[in-house]
């Protein structure tokens, strides 16, 4: 390919290489001409060319691409694969990285005998410039470390979700707050009159309390009769749910990660005949109830957005912990499934 470009532009292959990599030694006019000819010939950008052309559609493949490191946690190397939401994060990241001329390689932070210091050195010695931190797998509480102590001065870095408290990195997240409001609005439009929220405390911590914050905002507006006190359980127990349910008698439940769904099923309630159910992450409930109503978090778009942020930081030469971290929030979409129905519009 270098020879073809050199023949078309009338300069040496060395000059073509310098121009494609944005190095000194060629004039700006020559560089622009080389990039134009390269694009016409269907040259696939490696990350160096992406710095100059930002997002060329490719027609031919090259043997070598640059790597972005995906840092995962959990009990095993493949723990993250148990969750459809996280698989979609990674799928979205892979697809977007490929468009930029990168590939994504997983590095397990809990590898036996591995320290984060050593892992950072391994990534750096590989010439990897960009790091993506996947959501931390450990159950979160005030007693669990939520830090990733890597030498971030070596890399550009971004986080997917918001499970890491330190460092405060640029991150791509789902807009959990707006999704709760959207779920409440949709259930209200279906004429549900008493809508309850049931969450495991650790899961609400993973989103920094945004679900409960949004619910309480609407509770303040709509009143306690329509939105009873949320049931936030440090340790999910059926008896606690039964007491709460018997007291407030909701006709719809919002929950996530199959928690409220399992409570309703164990209680023997018909869904949606006796009570409606909406998930804050339909992918998380899909194993138990494949056609559940609720929020599609568009997790593949979150993963793609993380790569967008990371490649932009690499291209600008931004490494280390940012002084002012940036956030990209991706809105969810309501998915109407079989766990909710349109109810008669009766006066309460």
Model-flagged regions — what are they?
Residues 1-60, 348:
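N-terminal helix-turn-helix DNA-binding module of bacterial transcription factors
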Residues 15, 243-348:
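Flexible loop/turn connectors
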Residues 41-122, 129, 197, 201, ...:
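Amphipathic helical "hinge" segments at domain boundaries
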Residues 69-70, 127-137, 194-200, 227-231, ...:
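Periplasmic-binding protein-like
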Residues 113-129, 236-249:
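Short, well-structured alpha-helical segments in soluble
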Residues 134-179, 281-292:
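Flexible loop/hinge segments that line or gate small-molecule binding clefts
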Residues 168-197, 237-242, 296-317:
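Hydrophobic alpha-helical segments within soluble ligand-binding/sensing domains
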Residues 182-222, 322-339:
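An alpha-beta-alpha
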């Amino acid at each position: 390919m270098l020879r073809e470009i050199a023949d078309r532009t009338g300069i040496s292959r060395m000059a073509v290489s310098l121009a494609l990599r944005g190095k000194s030694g060629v004039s700006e006019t020559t560089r622009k001409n080389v990039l134009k000819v390269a694009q016409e010939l269907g040259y696939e950008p490696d990350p160096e060319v992406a710095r100059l052309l930002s997002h060329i559609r490719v027609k031919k493949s090259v043997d070598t691409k640059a790597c972005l490191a995906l840092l995962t946690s959990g009990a095993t190397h493949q723990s993250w694969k148990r969750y459809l939401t996280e698989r979609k994060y990674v799928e979205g990241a892979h697809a977007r990285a490929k468009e930029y001329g990168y590939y994504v390689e997983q590095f397990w932070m809990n590898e036996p005998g591995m320290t984060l210091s050593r892992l950072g050195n391994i990534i750096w010695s590989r010439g990897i410039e960009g790091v993506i931190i996947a959501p931390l797998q450990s159950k979160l509480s005030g007693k669990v470390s939520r830090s990733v102590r890597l030498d971030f001065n070596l890399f550009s870095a971004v986080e997917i979700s918001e499970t890491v408290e330190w460092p405060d990195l640029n991150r791509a997240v789902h807009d959990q707050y707006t999704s709760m409001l959207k779920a409440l609005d949709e259930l209200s439009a279906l004429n549900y009159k008493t809508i309850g929220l049931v969450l495991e405390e650790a899961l609400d911590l993973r989103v920094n309390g945004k679900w409960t914050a949004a619910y309480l905002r609407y509770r303040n507006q709509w009143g306690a009769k329509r939105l009873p006190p949320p049931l936030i359980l440090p340790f999910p127990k059926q008896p606690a749910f039964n007491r709460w349910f018997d007291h407030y008698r909701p006709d719809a439940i919002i929950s996530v990660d199959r928690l409220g769904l399992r409570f309703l099923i164990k209680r023997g309630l018909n869904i949606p005949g006796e009570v409606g159910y909406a998930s804050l992450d339909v992918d998380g409930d899909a194993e138990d109830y494949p056609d559940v109503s609720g929020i599609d978090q568009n997790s593949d778009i979150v993963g793609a957005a993380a790569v967008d942020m990371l490649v932009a930081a690499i291209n600008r030469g931004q490494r280390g912990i940012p002084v002012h971290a940036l956030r990209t929030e991706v809105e969810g979409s309501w998915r109407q499934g079989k766990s909710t129905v349109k109810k008669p519009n009766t006066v309460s």
